[in-house]
Amino acid sequence: MNQLDALKQYTTVVADTGDFKQLAQFQPQDATTNPSLILKAVQKPEYAPLLKDCVTRWHGRAIDELMDRLIVRFGCEILSIIPGRVSTEVDARLSFDTAATVARAERIVELYQAEGLHIDRVLIKIAATWEGIQAARQLEQRGIHTNLTLLFSFAQAVACGQAKVQLISPFVGRIYDWYKKQAGANWDEAAMAGANDPGVQSVRAIYNHYKHFGIGTEVMGASFRNTGQIVALAGCDLLTIAPELLAQLAASDAPVARVLDPEAARRVALQPVQYDEAGFRYALNADAMATEKLAEGIRAFAADAAKLEQLMQAAA
């Protein structure tokens, strides 16, 4: 049995790509997208017609609506291939505006419904800022499920659990990147692998907290740099993995053992934690890595959304 099939025994495998033509070979349950992945896809010849068709068909509509229609088009194509859910992201430029995030999320869901898709097959991705988490709280109360992304800290995870969001995406690789950069020449790759990887440790702590206290929010590890990080999180509710790493897992027969387990998490001695807005902001501010990576991630997604808009305007 290859590593990919072995991993599927313990964890729901999700494909992290806008390149939906790659999906079938890996047979993922779910898929995730983001502005960067959509931007990357539409610059390929096989996907460029989707952008052109969207601009032509809805000519004269506001650019933000065209953006939503394009990402929903990709989502619909993905949902025709996978049996589960697709995560579609709200414009990152709204990350500090609760009301605007809710409005865009509702429009995205309406666009999916207009294509005959049930809202249970869609997760709305929102950056895990305080404002984003409050938007997710409102959306969940209205039956719209959310995926809180750009999650780098325990405080973000706790606040998401309090808001009863459907799913969170803690970013393993970007946490790893930060600590590796900080260490510089002192970084020991072998010593910091597996259970010692700071990104892996972050997800394990969040998973154990959720399972120990019976928090229903799903944990989906994201942003991997190597298959070792993935294997070290076997048993996590879900793991979203880029096609390149899915291929590496499928090509390897190395053993995969379950690492994360809800029963084991319930036996860990943990103290309950809760945050109000002031406590959340202070805890996030105290975490230099999470503060820097959240800001950097929002800037990057916002920049790629702007580039996508430029491509759409050029195609008009």
Curated annotation (Swiss-Prot):
Keyword Calcium: no
Catalytic residues of the enzyme: 125
MF GO annotations: transaldolase activity
Pfam families: TAL_FSA (PF00923)
Any one Gene Ontology BP term: pentose-phosphate shunt
Keyword terms: Cytoplasm, Pentose shunt, Schiff base, Transferase
Record EC number: 2.2.1.2
GO CC, alphabetical: cytoplasm
Covalent S-S links between cysteines: none
Reactions that this protein is recorded to catalyse: D-sedoheptulose 7-phosphate + D-glyceraldehyde 3-phosphate = D-erythrose 4-phosphate + beta-D-fructose 6-phosphate
UniProt-annotated location(s): Cytoplasm
Pathway(s) the chain acts in: Carbohydrate degradation; pentose phosphate pathway; D-glyceraldehyde 3-phosphate and beta-D-fructose 6-phosphate from D-ribose 5-phosphate and D-xylulose 5-phosphate (non-oxidative stage): step 2/3
Job of this protein: Transaldolase is important for the balance of metabolites in the pentose-phosphate pathway.
HAMAP family assigned: Transaldolase_1
Entry's family note: Belongs to the transaldolase family. Type 1 subfamily.
Subunit structure comment from the entry: Homodimer.
PANTHER family (UniProt xref): TRANSALDOLASE (PTHR10683:SF18)
Protein name: Transaldolase
Originating organism: Acidovorax ebreus (strain TPSY) (Diaphorobacter sp. (strain TPSY))
Lineage: Bacteria, Pseudomonadati, Pseudomonadota, Betaproteobacteria, Burkholderiales
Gene name of the record: tal
